[in-house]
Amino acid sequence: MKDLSLHILDIIQNSISAGASLIQTEINENPEKDTYVLKIMDDGKGMNNETLQKAVDPFFTSRTTRKVGLGLPLLKQNAERTGGTFSLLSKQGEGTTVKAIFGYKHIDRLPLGDIGGVMALLSSANPALDFTYSHHSAEGDFEFDTREVKTELEGVSISHAEVNRFMKELINENIKSIEQS
């Protein structure tokens, strides 16, 4: 994948398939500690220990439509290529947490990409679900929560094209103002 927003899209699609109703995404930039942390948490059905152990194997997938599942293995590989780490925690009935720590200054760390477009797309395509996105850096913090957006819309669908465009611009402009990399 060419940027982190595409990894985020892939992981969140897994969360949606697992029946999650709330999916939280966090990014923490810390150049002083040379870390760029991506964390995605959901309240989906979770995984048993056997599935959890196999989840980062590219030749394992719970899907019946294909025989490989590259999302988690590619994210793990991209984190480790920068000197970072990857962890996957899950408990049946409670949800799953994916955490990738990248070397902040490493030349192979992927750019964030169009996170506003990804979050707006996911929110519009899944109006019954709730998404949060938080981004923290030394330059500031940004929080986005579809529950707040839905409240402000007063009956207008979060799937409306103008709302989608607004969410994308809101997220990307705020991230641009605080992103250090």
Task: Locate predicted features.
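Flexible, glycine-/charge-rich segments associated with ATP-binding catalytic modules
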Residues: K2, N78-S181
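Conserved beta-strand-loop-beta-strand hairpin that lines the nucleotide-binding pocket
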Residues: K2-H7, Q13-G69, P73-D108, Y133-F142
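Short, hydrophobic/amphipathic alpha-helical packing segments
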Residues: I8-L9, G116
